[in-house]
Structures are given as C-alpha cells and as structure tokens.
C-alpha cells in the first residue's frame, strides 16, 4: 500500500520519494533558491512545519535532507502533499573509478546536449534547462547515475586534487575532470573539462555568458 505525504503521515526522520520536481530554499522564510530536486529523488524529513503564533501565520516550509547528495534545504509543504511516496529505506550506490571513467563519454554528451537547449544561468538551478555552475556539473554526473555533492566548494573537497604543469595543462587534463575557480579559501565556480583544455560550464551575467558555454 502506497503511503503519500500528508500532515497526518508527517513523521520526523521518515524517508520519502518525490513524484514531482520541486524547488529547495535556503531557509524556512527565505525565497532564495539553493537547489532543485527532480522526480524520483529521495529525502528525509528533519524538521517540522513551523508556526508563527505572533503573526498567526503558518510557515509553509519543511526542512529536508536530500539523500543522494546529503544536501539540506527547505521545501514548500503545500507542494509536497500527495506528491511524495513513503519509502522504508535508502542506500547509496558505490561506483569504482573504472566504472565512473566508463561513463564519462555519456556525461559529456549530456552536457553538450544541455548547451544546445535554450537556457540561462539560474542560481540554485539543477533540473534544467537553466543551471548554476555546480548544478550543471552535478546533473551531468547524475544523468549517468553518479551522485556528487551539490555546491562547487563541496565538489572541490569531494574530488581528488591533481598536480598539473600550467604549460602543459591541456595535455594533462582528461575528459571529465572538474576545474575549480576561486580563492585558496573557497571555490566559487566549477566547469567540466571536455578536451584539449576546453571546458563547459554555466556562468552568470556579470562574469560570464548567462548560461552554458564552452
């Protein structure tokens, strides 16, 4: 018997699978988009619906942890009602280095196809056609069943650093390598290497192309 998410079935710590695409926000009262979750993704309820008794207002947000990338955000509860199915357990799938490498060609093909679609840069975008930089990279790998962290600085910490000679950079980089930009304190941008030093990325209006470009 399928159990759908409602106020009656709301239990902290319970696990659910999405039946819709949904936006994830920075906090319970912020409209800043930080991620998006697509149909089929799983999440855990980690905080209850909040009520603002002073203003007699119910805050329509629930705090969740997305299981595939361990990312925490807030969903609009009204969008979740009857749109998430209860699951009893969830396990991550482990990939060997060889298995990941074997999927790089299809990951690159997916990214190039995303570039051909009409798109623009969207902070917090991970579903498409509009992405932010790390959302594009995460979604590219997820298209082949490989989940990596959500944000660029998290992806940098997750990956293995490679020492490169700047003069032969294009020769040493391999297709599928991630390129990180920013300061020594924190990475602020990421791109996906294609070949010969060229990389594909989604960049904003101020410092980029307002969308996906090579």
State the predicted function of each range.
Residues 127-144, 148-151:
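Active-site nucleophilic cysteine motif
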Residues 3, 8, 13-22, 26, ...:
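Aromatic- and glycine-rich peptidoglycan recognition patches
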């Amino acid at each position: 018997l399928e159990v759908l998410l409602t106020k009656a079935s709301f239990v902290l710590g319970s696990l659910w699978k999405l039946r819709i695409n949904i936006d994830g926000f920075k906090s319970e009262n912020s409209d800043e988009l930080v991620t998006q979750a697509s149909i089929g993704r799983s999440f855990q309820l980690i905080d209850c619906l909040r009520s603002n008794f002073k203003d007699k207002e119910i805050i329509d947000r629930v705090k969740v942890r997305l299981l595939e990338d361990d990312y925490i955000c807030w969903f609009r509860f009204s969008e979740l009602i009857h749109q998430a199915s209860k699951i009893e357990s969830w396990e991550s799938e482990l990939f060997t280095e060889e298995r990941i490498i074997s999927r790089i060609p299809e990951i690159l093909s997916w990214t190039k196809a995303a570039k051909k679609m009409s798109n623009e840069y969207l902070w917090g975008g991970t579903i498409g056609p509009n992405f932010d930089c790390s959302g594009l990279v995460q979604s590219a790998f997820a298209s082949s069943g490989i989940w990596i962290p959500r944000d660029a600085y998290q992806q940098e910490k997750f990956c293995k650093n490679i020492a490169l000679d700047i003069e032969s950079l294009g020769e040493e980089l391999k297709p599928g390598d991630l390129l990180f930009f920013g300061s020594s304190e924190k990475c602020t941008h990421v791109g996906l290497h294609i070949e010969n030093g060229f990389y594909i990325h989604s960049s904003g209006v101020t410092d980029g192309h307002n969308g996906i470009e090579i």
